[in-house]
């Protein structure tokens, strides 16, 4: 695990290297593959951490990587890729393959950062944006196969909008034996309070409440839930069914206590953005107020193979943050926390995520389980399909089993 001490050590080592040019040449080479590179896009938030560094533990860290190439799929108005390439001296290539080979005939980078988010892409009938993450990955691994060498890969957010493709990506990474890290910033950002699910705890019910759009924030919400419940007794057992709800059905199940009424209350009590009526100070809203403010609540009810049930809730108009609560066996009080997302423009939670990408690039191993994001990618797909079809969906294909270590991996400094 990368720590402040190791960050400062690497930065100090670079500072002692004679000559800036020599220090740069000693750095590992990084290729960026991204949909777009615009202001406040994920490339702007994440790839640029490897251009000018980022804060960690009260110090400014400069990763021992040099961005040497990029592929930018779309260049809408406001594109910043050319300006960044000129400022930092990297080359933008017309294809993924050329970016990885840097115009030559062999793989010429030590790591690949994939950011398949934002841009204009078609949607499926279920509202899934068909971002080309799988297509990027296949081109990357095509280079690896042809050139007889691999490099670690970080993939931002979902693996793919199609679970079969997501599974193929994971299987390929394991078969070719290269480090593969992916997912949301939610599991690795700061928490208030800084708690984790006790390792090996028996979990009866869990919930995360947030705002946001479908196929975007539902994934973040599910990643927040999964990074907690995967620590439960027996480890991850996979998901057997998903059912989506919206509108009055959500309020009915919450108010009747079907989904853990006390967990909903704990989540709202952890929120820093809980909506209030005009002129009122911080109060717990009434059910009538919540129904008035949240025009169309959405929930995914997720059933796990070991009997655990979790609820993903999108409550636009009620909150603008992510809060989690869980009922642990033998504990009358829910475990609860806020996943803290520092504000724009700096959004330093992306720095926390890029520290995991950097660790993957340096060690060749992901510090977080790729199976987590495989599973959450599949739950997101199932949730959107259930919402469209209006029925519970059994998910035998989501029998994703894995174990995590005892050590926590979220930001604390």
Please name every model-derived segment:
Residues 12, 22-151, 161, 165-168, ...:
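N-terminal glycine-/serine-/threonine-rich beta1-alpha1-beta2 phosphate-ribose binding loop
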Residues 13-16, 25, 127-129, 284, ...:
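C-terminal helix-rich "cap/oligomerization" subdomain common to oxidoreductases
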Residues 30, 117, 158-159, 183-186, ...:
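An acidic- and aromatic-residue-enriched active-site/binding cleft used to recognize and process polar
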Residues 109-110, 195-199, 220-224, 254-264, ...:
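Short, surface-exposed amphipathic charged segments that create phosphate/polyanion-binding patches used
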Residues 138, 148-229:
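A contiguous active-site-proximal alpha/beta segment in oxidoreductase catalytic domains
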């Amino acid at each position: 695990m990368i720590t402040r001490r190791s960050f400062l050590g690497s930065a100090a080592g670079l500072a002692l290297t004679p000559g800036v040019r020599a220090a740069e040449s000693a750095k590992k080479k990084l290729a960026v593959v991204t949909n777009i590179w615009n202001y406040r896009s994920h490339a702007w938030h994440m790839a640029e951490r490897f251009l000018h560094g980022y804060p960690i533990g009260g110090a400014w860290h400069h990763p021992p990587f040099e961005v040497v190439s990029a592929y930018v799929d779309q260049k809408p108005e406001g594109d910043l890729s050319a300006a960044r390439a000129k400022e930092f001296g990297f080359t933008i290539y017309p294809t993924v393959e050329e970016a990885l080979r840097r115009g030559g005939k062999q793989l010429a980078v030590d790591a690949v950062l994939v950011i398949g988010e934002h841009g204009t892409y078609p949607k499926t009938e279920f509202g899934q944006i068909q971002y080309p993450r799988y297509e990027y990955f296949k081109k990357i691994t095509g280079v690896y196969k042809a050139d007889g060498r691999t490099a670690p890969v970080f993939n931002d957010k979902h693996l793919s909008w199609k679970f079969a493709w997501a599974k193929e990506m994971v299987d390929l990474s394991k078969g070719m034996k290269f480090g593969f890290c992916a997912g949301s910033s939610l599991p690795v950002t700061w928490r208030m309070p800084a708690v984790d699910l006790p390792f090996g705890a028996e979990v009866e019910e869990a919930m995360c409440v947030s705002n946001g759009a479908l196929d975007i924030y539902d994934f973040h919400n599910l990643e927040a839930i999964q990074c907690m419940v995967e620590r439960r007794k027996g480890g991850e057992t996979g998901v057997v069914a998903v059912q989506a709800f919206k509108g009055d059905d959500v309020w009915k199940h919450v108010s009747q206590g079907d989904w853990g009424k006390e967990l909903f209350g704990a989540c709202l009590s952890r929120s820093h953005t809980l909506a209030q009526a005009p002129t009122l100070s911080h109060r717990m809203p009434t059910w009538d107020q919540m129904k008035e403010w949240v025009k169309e609540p959405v929930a995914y009810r997720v059933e796990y193979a070991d009997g655990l049930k979790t609820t993903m809730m999108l409550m636009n108009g009620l909150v603008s943050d992510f809060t989690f609560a869980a009922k642990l066996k033998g504990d009358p009080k829910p475990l609860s926390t806020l996943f803290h997302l520092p504000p724009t423009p700096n959004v330093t939670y992306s720095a926390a995520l890029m520290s995991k990408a950097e660790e993957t690039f340096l060690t060749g191993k992901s510090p977080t389980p790729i199976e987590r994001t495989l599973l959450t990618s599949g739950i997101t797909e199932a949730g959107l399909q259930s919402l469209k079809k209006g029925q519970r969906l059994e998910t035998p294909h989501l029998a994703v089993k894995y174990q995590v270590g005892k050590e926590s991996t979220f930001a604390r400094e």
